[in-house]
Amino acid sequence: MHASTGKGSKIKYSRVLFKISGEALMGSRPFGHDMELIDQLCKDISDIYKLGVQVCIVVGGGNIFRGASASLSGCERASSDYIGMLATIINALILQNFLEKNSVNSKVLSAIPMVTICEPYIRRKAIHHLEKGRVVIFAAGTGNPFFTTDTAAALRAVETNCDAILKGTQVNGVYSADPKKNEDAVMYDRLSYMDLLTRDLKVVDASAISLARENSIPIIVFSLKEEKIVNIVKGHGTYTIVSDCE
């Protein structure tokens, strides 16, 4: 495992995309938002922001609505996905409010234009905001149905030239099996993109893995509860890194 080596370490990743699932915003709740957890999460983002790291965020909407699940219940898949995209905009605006509360200048850019509440997604505008020291929150996924927010995260990371994708989850890395169900599950320190695909380790979807692989962007999977983001950007802490290792 990767071990932390102290506060004085240099920054390893200067521009990162932080992928936050909607479920992560629920905390221990069955749905909705755990505002204390969100506040702490934004304080953690503030820590790396103050170090000069340029931060993008893609947030999911599963704490409010899951398009794939709704389609199984009879709702048309495309319509379900659009509703899910609207849920991500709600989450993005909540994150923006808590970031601003923690003195972090932030902008929400939506793939579905909603100009009265946020900016439309324009790649050059997003990069401009990052260069000006603003956290950029990408909402509404890719703006297209049938694509997950994991794929949106990989796409935005490629478009904005990020050094890494940080995927915060409920466990501290990628395991050989579900550690909650199998006590013999082994956590991987490092995997290749192909390992994720061939071993069917359902941490990130195949489209997102392909985009990251084609553009050599590492994916770092870590626990939102147990690990500080500031450790991750310094290359320390406990996590699994998915990269071009073979």
From Swiss-Prot:
Question: Where does this protein hold UMP?
Answer: G61, D81, T142, G143, N144, P145, F146, F147, T148, T149
Q: Name one GO molecular function term.
A: ATP binding
- Which residues does the annotation say bind ATP? K19, I20, S21, G22, G62, R66, T169, Q170, Y175, D178
EC numbers: 2.7.4.22
* InterPro entries, A to Z: AceGlu_kinase-like_sf (IPR036393), Asp/Glu/Uridylate_kinase (IPR001048), Uridylate_kinase (IPR011817), Uridylate_kinase_bac (IPR015963)
Query: What is catalyzed by this enzyme?
Result: UMP + ATP = UDP + ADP
Q: Which GO terms describe its cellular component?
A: cytosol
Q: What GO terms in the biological process aspect are recorded for it?
A: 'de novo' CTP biosynthetic process; UDP biosynthetic process
Q: Could you tell me which HAMAP family the record lists for this protein?
A: PyrH_B
Assembly, in brief, is: Homohexamer.
Query: What's this protein's family per the entry?
Result: Belongs to the UMP kinase family.
**Stated name of the protein:** Uridylate kinase
Q: Origin organism of this chain?
A: Wolbachia sp. subsp. Brugia malayi (strain TRS)
Q: What is the lineage of its organism?
A: Bacteria, Pseudomonadati, Pseudomonadota, Alphaproteobacteria, Rickettsiales
